[in-house]
Each structure stands twice: as structure tokens, then as C-alpha cells.
Amino acid sequence: MTRMLPEPAYRHGSVGKIGVLMINLGTPDAPTAKALRAYLKQFLSEPRIVEFPRWLWWFILNGIILNVRPAKSAKKYEQIWTSEGSPLRVHTARQTALVAALLEQQADSSLVVEYAMIIGNPSIAEKLQQMKVQGCDRILVLPLFPQYAASSTGCVLDGVFSELRKMRNIPDIRTVRHYHDDPGYIAALAQNVRDYWEKHGQPDKLIISFHGVPRKTLEMGDPYHCECQKTGRLLAEALELADDRYQICFQSRFGFAQWLGPYTAEILAELGKQKTGRVDVVCPGFVSDCLETLEEIALEGKAIFTEAGGGEFHYIPSLNEHPLWIEAIGNIIQTHLTGWADRRLSEEAAERSRKRALALGARE
């Protein structure tokens, strides 16, 4: 039996607020082996992230991976860590603050806008409880993954609904499934690339790199591959690129199984062997810069390309706090909030309800 968390006493006349919870993957608390061990244990224990027999995976994870990878991963994080902390957390916090300010200007009612992480801090559980304490009775969940995948957006929804099981008074919940072809998102991606090219010139080839997933997930019905392809195509069309000027590929392969291809590392190596003069890489699936962009692409990818004989290598930063991206998030949120009562009407209705309840003998 699920043990439900304590709830405050119900108060007649209380006015519920609307909350928006923006959720990203997560990050370790520090670039240390100890912090990485805790992070990787939680991350690699997610059944949607690693689809493997649980009993066998437990031995592999605890007997091998957690004794080897934390120290190696810590060294990678050390290379990208900032004075403010993890880039992913820093950018996600900034995005949240900017979106909150934008919505405050646009909306008739005050919104509570927070962010959480699937893995690490701040946790989904912590933020949902915090929003309930703040009086949110309607919460929109916005995964910061434009392309749906069971291992990303699916994990977000698992995390949210597992916490709802612990609540007696469950808030109204809406979720955003994906926005891989949202016009505002595509426009922000394209303008972000144009901004970079205006300062640094254009490449011979643009690599559009997405995080990979095992190929079997496509065969089992996951739409991720198709949504990545559509995002990449729409971005290339917005930039008016000929087919031979760009390549869509997938990075971050883990383990020995076949993943979605072509693999970014192999494409970079081949372009290097061809003595390509300049390659730029953009990662549309990562809306905030993180380990996979700043270390895997900007550092490792550059080394692969140049050591194979390539010329210039440029990594185009993620959307991060780009104004058009903040505007796009705001529009996506407003679209999904359609129909929820504004605060002024809620206050009027709540006051009438309170008076009726008191007349019937309610204490509060």
C-alpha cells in the first residue's frame, strides 16, 4: 500500500495557482567521483534508460560500471564545470527565470514557474511538493526534450506520476509530449545558427547531431528517430541548405548494441579523412549546453575531426537563453494552458464558495 504524504487541511475560499514545471535530465552535484557515482547509480537504474533484465543489470551496474565509470566521468565534467556549477543546471535555471518573467508580462494570472531534474537535484518530488505548498492546484509539466523518447520524456512522466501516487489531494496535471516541429522552436534553432555564422562565417558541412538511443527502440515503436529526422530537415530548410551541405547523425552511444545511426563520431572521422575544410556541429535535441555538447562534441568531436585530417571545427552552442527560444517556450506553455481559468475569475468563484460553505457550518 502506498503511504500518502500529509496534506494541509482543506480551506474553503482558497485560490489555487497554476504551476509550470520545466524538467530536464539532470546533472551531478559536483565533478567528483563520489558525486558521479551517486548520479550514475540513479541514472543507470532507470528502467526506461536501460532496458535490460533487472537482476542481471544490477550485477553489471554495481559490480563493474559503478567501480569504473565515476572517476572517468568526473574527469570529463571537470573540463566543463563552471564557477556557477554544472552548465546544464545553470542554463536550465536561467531559462526558468526568463520564462517566468515573460509569462508574468503576458498572463492575466500569476504563474508559479519552477524547474526540476529527472536525476539529481532539484528533484521532481521536491519541486512538486514545493508547488503544492505554494498553492498550485493545476500544474503543467514541460519536459525540456523537444523530441519524444521513452528514455527522456517517458522518464519525466514516470517521475511525475509516481509522485502523484503519494498525494491525497492530487493537482490537475497537463503534460507536453513533444515540440520537435514547433515553428517557434525551429525558428529559434535557425536564428541561433545564423547568429553564429554571422560572426564566424559558414562551414563546408553542418552536422546536426542528436543524442542516440538503441536502434531496437525504433523497431519497438519509439518515435524518437522520426522526430529527430523531422527537426533536422526543418532546420536545414529554414537555413536553405542543399542536401550535401548537412548531415543528420547520432551521438553518445553506450554499450555494444546497435544504436541509431549514422554515428556522429564516425561521420566526423570520415569528413576529416576527406580533408574537409570546415565542419560545424549543432545539437538541436539539447536545449541547454551540457556534458554531451561541451565535452563530447566541442572537445572530443573536434579531436576526432582534426586528428583525421580535417580543417576548422566549430561547435555552435545550444539554445540556452536565446531570446527566440525563451519566446518559443512561453508560447508552448500558453498553448497548453488554454482553458484553465484565470486568477481573477478563480478568486471570485472561490469567495462565493467560501461564503456558502460557512453558511452551511464549515469551520474555514
Swiss-Prot record:
User: How is this protein annotated for GO cellular component?
Assistant: cytoplasm
Instruction: Tell me which residues bind Fe cation.
Output: H211, E292
Q: What is its main location?
A: cytoplasm
Catalytic reactions on record = heme b + 2 H(+) = protoporphyrin IX + Fe(2+)
Q: Pfam families this protein is in?
A: Ferrochelatase (PF00762)
Task: Extract one GO BP annotation from the record.
Answer: heme biosynthetic process
Query: Metal-binding: present as a keyword of the record?
Result: yes
Give the pathway listed in the UniProt entry for this protein. Answer: Porphyrin-containing compound metabolism; protoheme biosynthesis; protoheme from protoporphyrin-IX: step 1/1
The record lists the membrane-crossing segments as none
Please name the InterPro entries in this protein's record.
Ferrochelatase (IPR001015), Ferrochelatase_AS (IPR019772), Ferrochelatase_C (IPR033644), Ferrochelatase_N (IPR033659)
Q: Where in the cell is it found?
A: Cytoplasm
What domain of life is recorded for the organism?
Bacteria
Tagged with keyword Lyase: yes
Keywords (alphabetical) are: Cytoplasm, Heme biosynthesis, Iron, Lyase, Metal-binding, Porphyrin biosynthesis
User: E.C. number, please?
Assistant: 4.98.1.1
Give GO MF terms, alphabetically: ferrochelatase activity; metal ion binding
Role this protein plays: Catalyzes the ferrous insertion into protoporphyrin IX.
Q: Which family does it belong to?
A: Belongs to the ferrochelatase family.
Q: What PANTHER family has UniProt attached to this entry?
A: FERROCHELATASE (PTHR11108), FERROCHELATASE, MITOCHONDRIAL (PTHR11108:SF1)
Q: What is this protein called?
A: Ferrochelatase
